[in-house]
Amino acid sequence: MRRQRERKSMPDAVKKVYLIHGWGANRHMFDDLMPRLPATWPVSAVDLPGHGDAPFAQPFDIEAAADAVAAQIDTPADILGWSLGGLVALYLAARHPDKVRSLCLTASFARLTAAEDYPEGLAAPALGKMVGAFRSDYAKHIKQFLQLQLLHTPDADGIIGRILPDLARCGTPSALQEALDAAERADARHLLDKIDVPVLLVFGGKDAITPPRMGEYLHRHLKGSRLVVMEKAAHAPFLSHAEAFAALYRDFVEGV
């Protein structure tokens, strides 16, 4: 795990923010969000193992990914995780509580696939159909994914133009497959009652990948959490509703 992009703070900054991307992406997914966060915050966006420029020398493991992020943190930090990155953030908070001051989980999950005791999850065929497109032609489908997320968003073409060239460098194919397999196997529900930090949950009302019911499950099981559903957003609220998302997150962190 490498800390790839870091924005230095002003001398009086006291908050450290770490941004953790989702499957099939890399740190550049946050390129449009970072400038909207307070200039006094030191913000680091990381690449998960095998994604972006991060090396991949072992099977992808959610717990190991969380440990790698923890190794970069020297004082309790505010963690924002998107999709798979939110799952990593849950493991980080449970395994390294001394490293986490607050959590923001956006379009994320404790478990991705449905089970008898977890109807909130996705049916396996639906999940397979969604990820199959990315496997067949990543560059094509990541652009289509962004276009769908930013539908009706002002300057959508500009946002896509800024982040797509770097985002399309998706990383190691074997790592992406292993990360997907790990996400499908993972079940962090048993960790939720161990997490004792402020939690903000932000979901998109139109998200078909991690629908709001997954956020409702997290909200019920993470004590003291706050759930916000952006009704017109889909799987990337921090892109499609960047200003509103940044303001929401800023107020949350400032209030911790």
From Swiss-Prot:
Gene Ontology terms: biological process: biotin biosynthetic process
Top-tier EC class: hydrolase
EC code(s) of this entry: 3.1.1.85
Binding site residues for substrate: W23, S83, L84, F145, L146, Q147, L148, Q149, H235
Stretches of the chain forming a coiled coil according to its record: none
Keywords, ordered alphabetically: Biotin biosynthesis, Cytoplasm, Hydrolase, Serine esterase
Primary location group: cytoplasm
SUPFAM superfamilies: alpha/beta-Hydrolases
Domain AB hydrolase-1 intervals: 17-241
InterPro entries registered for this protein in UniProt: AB_hydrolase_1, AB_hydrolase_fold, AB_hydrolase_sf, BioH
Active site (UniProt): S83 (nucleophile), D207, H235
Reactions listed under catalytic activity: 6-carboxyhexanoyl-[ACP] methyl ester + H2O = 6-carboxyhexanoyl-[ACP] + methanol + H(+)
Subcellular location: Cytoplasm
One GO cellular component, as annotated: cytoplasm
HAMAP family: Carboxylester (MF_01260)
Subunit structure: Monomer.
Function: The physiological role of BioH is to remove the methyl group introduced by BioC when the pimeloyl moiety is complete. It allows to synthesize pimeloyl-ACP via the fatty acid synthetic pathway through the hydrolysis of the ester bonds of pimeloyl-ACP esters.
Family assignment from sequence similarity: Belongs to the AB hydrolase superfamily. Carboxylesterase BioH family.
Protein's UniProt name: Pimeloyl-[acyl-carrier protein] methyl ester esterase
Organism: Neisseria meningitidis serogroup C / serotype 2a (strain ATCC 700532 / DSM 15464 / FAM18)
